[in-house]
Amino acid sequence: MNKLYIIEEVLYDYTPGMAVICASSLDRCREIFLEEFDWDCEIEEFDESIKQSMFKVIEGVNHAEGIVSYVYGGG
């Protein structure tokens, strides 16, 4: 089964957004994020959010791997 990663403090546009990704591991979660959001600033936001523990993990999720949902921040 996969895990659901809820990543906060990403996809900034004046204020932070968030992404919800279903993946088997945090490394795979990052790969999926990079496939969808490939701007350097978005990659840096993801890495910083992980470094600062700005994410939650729900284990044992019966959902296909990939982006579940996301929202950009906004002013």
Tell me the role of every PLM-derived stretch:
Residues 35-75:
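Short, mixed-charge low-complexity intrinsically disordered segments
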Residues 8, 24, 58-59:
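A structural detector for beta-sheet-dominated domains
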Residues 1, 23-32:
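A short, structured loop/turn motif at beta-sheet edges
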Residues 15-24:
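A short, exposed loop/beta-hairpin motif centered on an aromatic-Gly-Thr core
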Residues 15, 29-31, 66:
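Residues in flexible loops and secondary-structure boundaries
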Residues 1-16:
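Short aromatic-glycine-(Arg/Gly/Cys) micro-motifs in beta-strand/loop hairpins
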